[in-house]
Structures are given as structure tokens and as C-alpha cells.
Regions:
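Solvent-exposed loop/turn and edge beta-strand elements of beta-rich ligand-binding domains
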Residues: 1-353
Length: 353
């Protein structure tokens, strides 16, 4: 066969040759959707192909500073993935995966990571306190941000705007950022009492709608504005007790009341509005001419007075009818008697002649 030639090479003065790993670095800036620096984000650098982005699986981890800056030092040669592990409070975890490649010694790769605010919605349903199935429209609600975060409504809190009224007495404000808010009723629906209290609500989960109530399990209730009605009864013969009066309204109110010994009826807690008042035709009012119906306007926190007068019917009594007949009979008898006596006297005188 052929002989193989052996060549001896000598390099580096006979010392072993070592390959040094190339290292670079990654630096970045963390900001929110408004472009403001964002600290407190935990960020990791991972091997490509990683499926679970946890601290345990990361090659390195770091936390963004208050000025939003972060960096990874001594990143080995190759391609890596940068991914957020924990978001700052109030922000949605970023699932963006940014690939970075270190290809030469001391190379610095710069990146930017953005976090978006947690945003939620607030909603309330306006309800009639007396009739919960009756949903109220026409209210105006203001929403304030708890700017100083003290949990108390004060002059420093910022007005975010007014809630939008949807159909069916539902009011809503959407896309509110993470934090605490206050809801205050600015204008009550017509005929209802304004709720002057302020109600707090916190946005904590992204995409969630939070319900504001002033009565748990019912909704945001309003009491109706109310007043009183007084009916005063008079009559030509002085009788006033026990007469019945009917009071109605367009919203379904329909009640009948009787006058007391003073001829009065006092009704409290009537919703403001128009109430027709009519006297009931019954045994108590049978001998009287009933008065015309009257319209009573009930106003907030006041008493409306309605006066109703009865005239007694002027009809002859049974005893008077008897006496009149008796007198007529007696008068007729007298006339007849006088005629008979005159006739007898006339005949007697003629006979004497």
C-alpha cells in the first residue's frame, strides 16, 4: 500500500488554543401606552422554542427601573427571546415575544416593550324604590377618578365625564383605566329625589364590568318625590262625617277614603302629580247634590287642600205632605158646608113668602 505522510505543525508555541464565547448585551426601555416610562416590570430572556415564560425557565431576569430602563448583560452568542414575566400593577401582561440576536463581541441590542393599562367598565341600573321593576330614565351620573388615591371624594378628584344612558334605565361608562373611581348622581329623573351620596368603585381586572348599586341586589334606587292631599268636606246642613271620596291618578293609584268627624281626609305619601277627586254616591250622600269632581295637584313636600261642598236636596217631607192634604180637605168641606146652609136658608125664606 501507500505510505501516509505525517506532518507535525506547531502553533501558539505549543500551547492549547482556546475559543472564547462571544457575549453581547440587551438593553431596553419599558413604557406605557402613553409613552411614559414604566418601572416594576419583570422581564426574562429565554431560549428560542420556550413555551412557558416563567422565572424558572429564564436564562436571566431583570426588573425595569423607575425610568423604564432594563438590561441583560453577558448574553451569549445566538438568538434569544425577550418576554415579560410579570406586569407592573395596573397593566395587562404583555405577551409580545421579541427575538434578539447577539452576533459579535460586545454587541448591544436595543429594544422597547410597551404595557397597556388594565381597563374595565362601570354600569348601573336606575330603579324606582317603590316599584323595582320600573326602570328610570333621564338621570345624569358623573364619574370621578380618585386622583390622590385616598379613597375619599374631594376637590382634587378629576371628573372623567358622564355615564352614557342605554335603553331600559341602564347607564354605563367604558374603557376606564385601572384604579378607584367615584360615581355621583348629578340629575335625578323627573319626579324623583336626587341621591346626594357618592359611591366608590374600583377597576381591577381587564375587560370586566363592575356594577354600582346604592341598594345591594336591587340597583341604584331613587325615591319618588311625594306630597300630601287634604280633602275638606262641608254641607248645607252641617253634616260632614262618613262621606266617601275616591282619589285616582294616571299611574294606577285608586283609593277610597271616608271623612272623619271634622269632615276631613288627610292622605300622606302621594307621588307628585295630578289626582282627580270625586265624591262617592252612596247611602251617606243620598240626600245631597254631589259636587263636581276636582283636580288636585300634589307638589313636593307640601299639602294640597281640596274643598268639597254638598247642598241638601230641598224636597217636601212626608209629614208636610199629610198636613197639606188635610188643610185642603178641610177647606173644601167648609166651602161645601157653606153652600148647603145657604141653599136651606133660601128655601125657608121662600116658603114664608
Amino acid at each position: 500500500g501507500q505510505d501516509t505522510a505525517i506532518v507535525h505543525l506547531s502553533a501558539n508555541d505549543g500551547e492549547a488554543i482556546e475559543n472564547e464565547i462571544i457575549y453581547g448585551s440587551v438593553s431596553g426601555l419599558k413604557s406605557d401606552e402613553d409613552g411614559k416610562a414604566l418601572g416594576g416590570a419583570v422581564i426574562g430572556i429565554f431560549k428560542t422554542g420556550t413555551e412557558e415564560f416563567t422565572k424558572e425557565n429564564a436564562i436571566q431576569t431583570t426588573t425595569s427601573a423607575d425610568d423604564g430602563s432594563f438590561s441583560f448583560e453577558k448574553v451569549p452568542y445566538g438568538t434569544w427571546v425577550i418576554r415579560e414575566i410579570e406586569s407592573p400593577t395596573g397593566f395587562v401582561l404583555s405577551e409580545e415575544e421579541i427575538a434578539v440576536t447577539v452576533g459579535k463581541v460586545d454587541e448591544v441590542v436595543e429594544i422597547e416593550l410597551v404595557n397597556y393599562f388594565i381597563k374595565g367598565n362601570i354600569e348601573l341600573t336606575k330603579v324606582d324604590a317603590d316599584y323595582p321593576d320600573n326602570k328610570l330614565t333621564g338621570a345624569v351620573f358623573e364619574v370621578y377618578a380618585d386622583t390622590n388615591g385616598n379613597g375619599e371624594f374631594d376637590k382634587d378628584d378629576k371628573l372623567c365625564g358622564e355615564m352614557t344612558e342605554l335603553e331600559g334605565g341602564v347607564y354605563q361608562m367604558t374603557e376606564l383605566r385601572y384604579g378607584k373611581y367615584f360615581v355621583r348622581e348629578k340629575t335625578a329623573p323627573d319626579g324623583f329625589v336626587l341621591d346626594e351620596s357618592v359611591y366608590g368603585v374600583s377597576i381591577e381586572e381587564n375587560g370586566k364590568t363592575y356594577t354600582v348599586e346604592n341598594k345591594a341586589g336591587v340597583g341604584f334606587i331613587n325615591d319618588a318625590q311625594k306630597g300630601s292631599l287634604k280633602i275638606v268636606k262641608t254641607s248645607s246642613d252641617g253634616k260632614v262625617e262618613g262621606f266617601s271620596f275616591r282619589v285616582t291618578s294616571a299611574d294606577g293609584y285608586d283609593q277610597t277614603f271616608k271623612t272623619d268627624k271634622n269632615g276631613e281626609i288627610f292622605i300622606e305619601g302621594l307621588r307628585i302629580g295630578e289626582y282627580p277627586v270625586s265624591e262617592v254616591s252612596d247611602s251617606a250622600s243620598a240626600g245631597y247634590i254631589l259636587p263636581a269632581d276636582k283636580q288636585a295637584t300634589v307638589k313636593t313636600d307640601s299639602t294640597t287642600i281640596v274643598e268639597m261642598h254638598n247642598e241638601f236636596r230641598d224636597t217636601p217631607k212626608t209629614g208636610d205632605d199629610f198636613n197639606l192634604g188635610l188643610w185642603v180637605s178641610l177647606a173644601a168641606a167648609s166651602v161645601i158646608g157653606a153652600g148647603v146652609l145657604g141653599f136651606v136658608g133660601f128655601k125657608k125664606k121662600k116658603k114664608e113668602d
